[in-house]
From Swiss-Prot:
Protein name: Ribosome maturation factor RimP
Pfam families attached to this UniProt entry: DUF150_C, RimP_N
Matching NCBIfam families: PRK00092.1-2 (NF000928)
Organism for this UniProt entry: Thermoanaerobacter sp. (strain X514)
GO biological process: ribosomal small subunit assembly; translation
Length: 151
């Protein structure tokens, strides 16, 4: 986490805690000629537009007071979306029993992607039901995990 991301995280936590929101992620990056500070939040039942506005206004005021960013940037506060990557233990716990897609750094059985039902997460390992059998993946070899969205 960069210094700017850490400052934004520290500044936004009071409003999140007050409203029982979860901080999913903070990212500060340049896209094209613009810098973006993005804050992704969530809560039980899902985040609303009003929730995002509340957090955005609060964080904008705090950032103006501290002024940690020397150049212009765009502040965005949003929900992480349905297909957000699973990163924290809580993300995995919420998705037990659901279909996930796992991408690997190093292939297993000549494959780098697996899809199956998440049946267990231990912190070090992800265990899915893949083609009717338990399959374990070491987190050190996992590059990305995200839910499978079916409509």
């Amino acid at each position: 986490m960069s210094k700017i991301e850490q400052i934004a995280k520290d500044l936004v936590m009071p409003i999140l805690e007050k409203n029982n929101f979860e901080l999913v992620d903070v990212e500060y990056k340049k896209e094209g000629s613009h810098w973006y500070l993005r804050v992704y939040i969530d809560k039980e039942g899902g985040i609303t537009l009003d929730d995002c506005q509340l957090v955005s206004e609060y964080l904008s005021d705090r950032l103006d007071e501290v002024d940690p960013i020397e150049h212009s940037y765009i502040l965005e506060v949003s929900s992480p979306g349905l297909d957000r990557p699973l990163k924290k233990p809580r993300d995995f716990e919420r998705n037990i029993g659901k279909e996930i897609e796992i991408s690997l750094y190093t292939p297993i059985d000549k494959r780098k992607k697996f899809e199956g039902e998440l049946i267990e997460f231990t912190g070090d390992k992800i265990i899915i039901l893949y083609n009717g059998e338990r399959k374990e993946f070491d987190m050190k070899n996992v590059s990305l995990v995200k839910p499978v969205i079916k409509f």
